[in-house]
């Protein structure tokens, strides 16, 4: 397949491009500078994406967006989080809709943050949306993909959970503390963490290129855990204690209250119902299996 990818230099994008190329696909990257071979230049802020450059494409995968946990949520960064998703998605979806030879599938990024903090409730793709900042961002983000589906292109909304990889994200940030025996649960540890290994994240995305699935798909492992379970499992895998709970005031002072709450002290108990129904077979269905594989323990 000829596959165009935005966000190819990101944490998920790099691994995805590598696997797709290993499997014989022709991958073309969207870049915001002068394009080299195997690249297409675009400028989302200026609304520039040449539809003719996408002709002959079998699939488009859209993964770009400002990092949720990269900076404190100032009003300007909140706007960047939103617009880096909505403007880019709108441009790609509308460009696809205008093409003479449209791709067969559009896989567009989203996140399980769309459900908001929900306590013990088990959440699937048909669950209602939440009312938090991230829920609002995700809802608008998904809405901008609609022109592609309205034009008859199979559109999948990739509601990604916490992606585990030692190369970046939450696991990379926590690992040094746990290796020193300084890890601990956040607050009471009862908040749910719906995680997925990087191998299953990219495996599921590749699976969805051809699976007969459209609409929202939760990209999470089938066995979410509480933060206390995550903490004890990671400590066991690295063979270090993790006795000291981390009180809310410390992360909130560093990250800001809203960001700390969203990333550390609230969560969602998400089930990948659509992915399971599609026949995808998880490489790492449980957390301990995933961590031992990722950390080579």
What function would you assign to each model-found segment?
Residues 3-23:
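N-terminal Rossmann NAD(P)H-binding glycine-rich loop of SDR-like oxidoreductase domains
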Residues 110, 143-166:
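Conserved beta-loop-beta element that borders a ligand/cofactor-binding pocket
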Residues 90-132:
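Conserved Rossmann-fold NAD(P)-dependent oxidoreductase catalytic core, especially the SDR/UDP-sugar
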Residues 139, 151-153, 164-173, 207-217:
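Glycine/proline-rich active-site loop of Rossmann-fold NAD(P)-dependent oxidoreductases
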């Amino acid at each position: 397949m000829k596959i165009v990818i935005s966000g190819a230099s990101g944490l998920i994008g790099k691994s995805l491009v590598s696997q797709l190329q290993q499997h014989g696909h022709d991958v073309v990257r969207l870049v915001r500078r002068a394009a080299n071979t195997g690249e297409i230049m675009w400028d989302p802020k200026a609304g520039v994406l040449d539809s003719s450059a996408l002709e002959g494409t079998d699939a488009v995968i859209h993964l770009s967006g400002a990092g949720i946990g990269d900076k404190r949520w100032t009003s300007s960064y909140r706007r960047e989080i939103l617009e880096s998703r909505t403007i880019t998605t709108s441009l790609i979806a509308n460009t696809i809709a205008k093409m003479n030879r449209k791709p067969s599938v559009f896989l567009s990024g989203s996140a399980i943050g769309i459900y908001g903090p929900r306590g013990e409730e088990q959440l699937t793709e048909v669950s209602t949306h939440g009312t938090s900042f991230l829920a609002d961002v995700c809802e608008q983000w998904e809405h901008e993909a609609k022109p592609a589906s309205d034009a008859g292109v199979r559109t999948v909304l990739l509601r990604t959970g916490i992606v585990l990889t030692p190369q970046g994200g939450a696991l990379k940030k926590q690992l040094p503390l746990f290796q020193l025996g300084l890890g601990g649960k956040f607050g009471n540890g009862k908040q749910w963490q719906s995680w997925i290994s990087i191998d299953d994240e990219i495996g599921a995305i590749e699976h969805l290129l051809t699976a007969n699935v459209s609409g929202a798909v939760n990209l999470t492992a089938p066995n979410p855990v509480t933060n206390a379970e995550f903490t004890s499992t990671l400590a066991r895998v690295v063979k270090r204690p993790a006795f000291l709970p981390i009180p809310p005031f410390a992360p909130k002072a560093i990250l800001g209250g809203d960001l700390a709450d969203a990333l550390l002290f609230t969560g969602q108990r998400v089930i990948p119902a659509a992915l399971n129904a599609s026949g995808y077979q998880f490489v790492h269905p449980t957390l301990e299996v995933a961590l031992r594989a990722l950390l080579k323990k």
